[in-house]
From Swiss-Prot:
Enzyme class at the top of the EC tree: isomerase
Lineage of source species: Bacteria, Bacillati, Actinomycetota, Actinomycetes, Micrococcales
SUPFAM superfamilies, alphabetized: PLP-dependent transferases
Enzyme nomenclature, EC number: 5.4.3.8
GO-annotated molecular function: glutamate-1-semialdehyde 2,1-aminomutase activity; pyridoxal phosphate binding; transaminase activity
Coiled-coil boundaries: none
Oligomer status and interactors: Homodimer.
Record-given protein name: Glutamate-1-semialdehyde 2,1-aminomutase
Origin: domain of life: Bacteria
Family: Belongs to the class-III pyridoxal-phosphate-dependent aminotransferase family. HemL subfamily.
Pathway: Porphyrin-containing compound metabolism; protoporphyrin-IX biosynthesis; 5-aminolevulinate from L-glutamyl-tRNA(Glu): step 2/2
Gene: hemL
Length: 439
């Protein structure tokens, strides 16, 4: 028995499913998840001594690679000063200044500890600011495990084939309108049906939790136009894309491409904490000033702005310069080219969905692509399991769900890329040979 198997057996006796986040249990791909002992640069090492090239990157935060010396030094220095004070520190202001400086529409931000807290607070703030009750979300977009946003939420719910979550009351769900993604007409119809009642539309900047889905040209701009006309807020969830696809997040990528829209509120997470639990919401000063202590919308957190997490986030973002993003983009393009070559040679039907350096693989979608949650759920997901395990056996760690994005870092060098690319042909053949499950 492997050490990972032994630890997984122990974990299942004391934790639901043996994990603290469902996707880690490997339910959708099967097998025993490797228990990770250490990580450095682009590599993970498990408790059995196996090394993997990492294409999960802690679900995004490891932008410049694991255990980057600048980040670890900053964290060590912060730890020596104390783990937390329950009081305001210099690091909070410095990280806030850096984020506000990078993302032009931001005027103020509030640090929290998780992306879920950020989106939960953004919804409360939108309702408090507008005095309205309804919220619009899009099917397949994931905004954390906020009760009112779990309907058709993609990510873990899609992995587990669940439409929503038990424990969410009908009254809570009734305050959320769920619309098809990339459907401007549906959004216009919702506002026509509920004039003056919608507090906000929340959307992933570019969905990455039903696989990666590209917003159709003008979709985010249409959300901005429609919300503004009705007096509702637009909340752009950049928990995953923020500082991952561009130094100013997806908004920065879009702005660089010539788009001129901007939301009222942003949410950030993952990269902003450099691997430690940190997230934030931010936006226009007029809206943000509704948060306590300056306004009537309450939000608080004992560990919000934790000094060690601030140090990790600040060091990571300072290292994430133009060269780092260029490297990640180049490596992502190289991997996508190798993936296409291997899958084409194996005769597999597929499409690759991409936004900046982020991408995902969807089997059986060459003719249609993936434009919304219905498309994502219609893919030949059964082909991903043998593909995943062939890569894992070859020492490449992929997301253990077909509904998640692939991540690279600035630390993925030629050696790491060679290992990934050499593993792809056998994995592609395994996917080609896969058979659909029997009814």
């Amino acid at each position: 028995m492997s050490v990972s198997q032994e630890l997984f057996d122990r974990a299942r006796r004391v934790m639901p499913g043996g994990v603290n986040s469902p996707v880690r249990a490997f339910n959708s791909v099967g097998g025993t998840p490797p228990f990770i002992a250490a990580a450095k640069g682009p590599y993970l090492t498990d408790v059995d001594g196996r090394e993997y090239v990492d294409l999960v990157c802690s679900w995004g935060p490891a932008l410049i690679g694991h255990a980057h010396p600048v980040v670890t030094e900053a964290v060590h220095e912060a730890v020596e000063r104390g783990l937390g004070f329950g009081a305001t520190t210099r690091g909070e202001t410095e990280l806030a200044e850096l984020v506000v400086d990078r993302v032009a529409p931001l005027e103020e931000i509030r640090m929290v500890s998780t992306g879920t807290e950020a989106t939960m607070t953004a919804l409360r703030l939108a309702r408090g600011y507008t005095g309205r009750d309804l919220v619009v979300k899009f099917a397949g977009c994931y905004h954390g495990h906020v009760d009112s946003l779990l309907s058709e939420a993609g990510s873990g719910l899609a992995t587990l084939a669940l439409p929503g979550s038990a424990g969410v009351t009908e009254a809570t769900a009734a305050q959320t309108l769920v619309l098809p993604y990339n459907d401007v007409a549906a959004l216009e119809a919702a506002f026509a049906e509920h004039p003056g009642r919608i507090a906000a539309v929340i959307t992933e900047a570019a969905p990455c939790n039903m696989g990666v889905v590209t917003p159709q040209d003008g979709f985010n701009a249409a959300i901005r136009r429609i919300t503004q006309a009705d007096g509702a807020l637009m909340i752009l969830d950049e928990v995953l894309t923020g500082f991952r696809v561009h130094e100013a997040g997806y908004w920065g990528l879009s702005n660089a491409a010539g788009e001129s829209w901007a939301p009222d509120l942003f949410t950030f997470g993952k990269v902003i904490g450099g691997g430690l639990p940190t997230a934030a919401l931010g936006g226009r000063r007029e809206v943000m000033e509704y948060l306590a202590p300056t306004g009537p919308v309450y939000q608080a957190g004992t560990l919000s702005g934790n000094p060690v997490a601030m140090a990790a986030g600040l060091a990571t973002l300072k290292c994430a310069d133009a060269v780092a993003y260029q490297t990640i983009d180049r490596r992502s393009e190289q991997l996508r080219a190798g993936l296409r070559e291997a899958l084409d040679a194996a005769g597999v039907d597929y499409s690759i969905q991409e936004v900046g350096s982020l991408f995902s693989l969807a089997f059986g979608t060459r003719s249609t692509g993936v434009h919304d949650y219905a498309d994502a759920k219609g893919q030949e997901a059964f082909r991903y399991t043998p593909f995943f395990h062939a890569m894992l056996d070859a020492g490449v760690y992929l997301p253990p769900s077909v509904f998640e994005a692939w991540f690279l870092s600035a630390a993925h060098d030629d050696s790491a890329m060679d290992r990934i690319l050499s593993a792809l042909p056998a994995a592609a053949r395994a996917a080609a040979e896969a058979q659909p499950p029997q009814p």
